[in-house]
Every structure is written in structure tokens, then in C-alpha cells.
């Protein structure tokens, strides 16, 4: 299968809970013979550089680099809207462009979304099956 895997934290290196689970899923899917493309956010140039190691575990990856001040402003801008403010926090126009390009450029068998906050990147896609892993769903947030 050709799988587009979208997650809210860049999954490499796998040294925290928000990275370990998606990393292991990506590694398993790739080892099982699936073509996996990872799309995610990096919070700094250093994290983006460190994250390059994911290339050994997937076919390719795309990332958007975001910063805390910009993420916070995007989150606050969404407060008067009916959509969750966390969608603003996890939105990257650069990553959205990359995801859109990937979706148009090739045929996908599955879109796997790890965490609800990044489902926005593929919410308009109707022609590809999607799995949404609510790994971020807990009573303290919702």
C-alpha cells in the first residue's frame, strides 16, 4: 500500500511519547512492505535537522517548521471560531502545500492521521480511505 502518514510531532528521534508511537507504527508499516510518506511538523531548525533520520524508516518525508510564537498566534486567532483552537496551533501553510502536492501527484491507498489536531490537512479528501488515530484523546483535553 502507498500510505500517507500525518502526525503532529516529527517522529524522529523516538525519544518522547508523542514520537515513539508514530515512529514504531511507521517503522512497522515500512518493514511490512508498505510505501510510507511521513508528513509532520518540526518546532525548530535543530529538530528538523535531527528528524532527517526518519528517512531510514520511510520512503520519504515532508515537514513544516513552526515556531511557538506563531503557533500561539494562530491558536488565539481561532478562539472566536467554532473550530478547536488547537487546529490553529498545529497548522502550517508550508506543510499544507506539501500535503496538497503529494495528494495531487500520486495515488494513495490510505491516509493515516495520528492525532486529531492534524486531521485538518486532509479533511477535504474524500477519495482515499482514512484512519484517524485519536492518540491525543484524553479527558484532560476534551
Where are these regions (language model features)?
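Short, solvent-exposed loop/turn segments at secondary-structure junctions
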Residues: 10-11, 43-45, 68-69, 116-119, ...
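Structural motif
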Residues: 2, 109-110, 129
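Short loop/helix-cap segments at secondary-structure boundaries that form the rim of catalytic
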Residues: 51-55, 121-127
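N-terminal subdomain of nucleotide-sugar transferases
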Residues: 1-62, 104-106
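Redox-cofactor binding/interface segments in oxidoreductases and associated redox assembly factors
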Residues: 5, 113, 132
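Conserved nucleotide-sugar donor-binding subdomain of glycosyltransferases
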Residues: 67, 72-125
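Active-site proximal beta-strand in glycosyltransferases
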Residues: 126-142
